[in-house]
Amino acid sequence: MMELGNYCFYIYIKQPKNKQMKRIFLSAFLLVSLSLSAQNIDRKQVVERNNPHLVTMDSLNSLSVGNGGFAMTVDGTGLQSFPKSYSKGIPLGTMSDWGWHSFANPENYKPEESWRYYDYGRGRKEPYATQIKEDKRKKAAGDWYRVNPHRLHLGTLGLSLGSDPKNIQQVNQILDMWDGMIKSSFIYHGRAYQVETTCHPELDMIATHVQSKGSIAFDIRFAYPTGGHCDDACDWNKDHLHSTMLVSQDKNSAVLKRTIDETVYFVMLRWQGTAKLKQKGKNFYQLQSKSADLKLTCEYAEQISSESKTFAEVADAAKVYWNRYWQKGAMVDFGQCKDPRAQEMERRVVLSQ
């Protein structure tokens, strides 16, 4: 498709078979293309007019921030405040490339117990993992290897706003793709909230800035994995099978150690403002503040990290990364096209990147 002024042209090219004619044809086509070239595309304008914009709490409309190796999905509050309400829609996950878990294997199942041998035409029989039903142990082995290892939900970070998302009113949420920031505002029991959420481009770290008329509290919850392939990866009824231990704490930071079977990882919390971390359950902590303005970073890692980033530092790093990202590679601008399908086509092209 080529754009010229207010018109869009779909060009079908049938190349000549003769090589000499091909060269002439290609040269002529390039000259025409250059003569019709428009002004440089305003990439920022194109990206921003296609920013996802939500105005309701909808479990089928969740937004995410991430860096390619780590991501966090949020609800209409800009954080993971209602994970159970979103579990049947687009779940509020927090996952990384390194975050994998396997259930205990007390029966010591071996991979070869789930194998059948087939001839694939290469002169020998080769093993293939299957579900063997006629042998109970082999069936159990196959079932175990079907779900292990599996992706690990690292934890939910949400605002303490009760359990009913219907109490969240006047949602206005935008994913600012140009700067890599989710900007959310809403009303909860008459109180206005403004929330900014972003992700560091190189670290498995979320940063959030919350403003509200009144006190602010963050809920940090952890669930046991399910091993399922089409759920939210959270089993909230097995607290006895995992633990969350407070390793260290000072007035502006805390380190939590997560132990799930043989899987161990750490969660580093750092905040700007007056707040106190309290344990509310075996795998439930709450960061409480009387301040109306609180900034928090939450990093997940296999080892305790010495990185200490403020919200502003994470937001600036994300902005630099995403600004550069959108300024590289190809870009389309259908803003002047009169075809009614152009806007939707542009939206799909931009979001697919």
Where are the predicted features?
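Hydrophobic h-region of N-terminal signal peptides that target proteins for export
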Residues: 29-38
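Positively charged n-region of N-terminal signal peptides that target proteins for export
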Residues: 17-24
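Intrinsically disordered, low-complexity terminal segments enriched in Ser/Thr
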Residues: 11-13
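Acidic/polar, glycine-enriched structural segments that form the non-catalytic walls/loops
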Residues: 39-353
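Methionine residue identity
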Residues: 1-2
